[in-house]
Structures are given as C-alpha cells and as structure tokens.
Amino acid sequence: MKKTVTPLRSLCAALAALVLLVALAAPAFAADGFADLYYRMNDSAEVLTEDEDGELEASLEELSVRQSFDVIIATIDSLESEGCTSMEEYADDLYDYCQFGYGENRDGVLLLVSIGDRKWHISTCGYGITAFTDAGIQYLGEQMTPDMADGDYAAAFRTFIQWTDAYVTAAREGHPYDVDNMPKEPFSIVYLG
C-alpha cells in the first residue's frame, strides 16, 4: 500500500521549518528588549579592580534597564593591539558585532577607551544619536578626562554613567544637551564674599 502525504500536512511541516529557521536566525533578545550576549563593562585592558568592574557592570545594567537604553563601556590596550587604526571604526564595529542596543532601533551609547593611545570615543546608535550631540559628547569628555589622565578609570566611568543618565533624561524631556542647552556648572559655595 502506497503512503500519500496530504497537502495540509506538507504545508504544516513547511511552516514549522520556516518558524524554526526564523527563530534561530534572529538575535537572542531577552524579554526586556536587549540582546543578552555580552557584558556592558568590557575591561579588556584590565585597568579596573575586580570590585570596580563588578560595581560598574551593576551600574550599567541598572541604568540600561531603567532608561530602556543600552550603556556600554569598553577598554582596549591600544588600537594597534586590536589591529585597527580608527577609534570610531572600532567602537562602531564593537557595538554592531556584540549586538548592543535596546529595541528595534538598538538605542544606546558605547564609550571606548584606548589606554595605550590615551584616546576615547563615544559611539551612538538609535536614540543615542538624539541624546548625545557633538557638543554634548565634547562636554562629557571634558568631565571624564581629568580622572582618566590621573589613571582613575573607575571614577571616569562613574562620571560617564552619571552624565549618560542625565543626557538621556534631558533628551526625553525634549531638551538634549547641545550648544544652546549645555549642563549648568554646579554652584560653588566656596567663595561667597
């Protein structure tokens, strides 16, 4: 007796195979909208203590989830050690390769620090482009570089995290930090007379 396959059974098998293929081809996103592939604190240059690394990873995680905006910090020894010549290119490639970002627009920001080259670069994607203007990035760099120059990378990264929170909040309120809307300098009570 010859066995025949019904068209309905063939259609169901084809659809099941298609669903499986799409599920395997799509990046693995967690329920919260982030790709769940890499740590947000990537200290390849090993400039942080284990405690600092853990503290910063927790801060990046908390901020990213609360703001629905991926915030990443990466250190490298040098561009040469990575076989690259451009901070911008390396930062953008790292962001893409690791599938960082929140949601379909991959909203986020990545700070890359090359220790040996004494350079830093901020890469933005999705809503990060709105929140981090060129003037805002320059201002943020001015806030971080004194600590980096002193070799206190943990302090510089804490500054980056705090300002990133402020930048995203200001942008969501319709006032991203830019040339005509820069953060106000803190009021000093040291000299009042």
Question: Could you say what each language-model-derived stretch is?
Answer:
Residues 13, 190-193:
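Hydrophobic H-region at the start of alpha-helical membrane spans
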Residues 13-25:
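Bacterial N-terminal signal peptides
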Residues 2-15:
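Bacterial N-terminal signal peptides that target proteins for export
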Residues 6, 20-23, 48:
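N-terminal non-cleavable signal-anchor helices
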Residues 29-191:
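Folded, non-transmembrane soluble domains that reside on the lumenal/extracytoplasmic side of membranes
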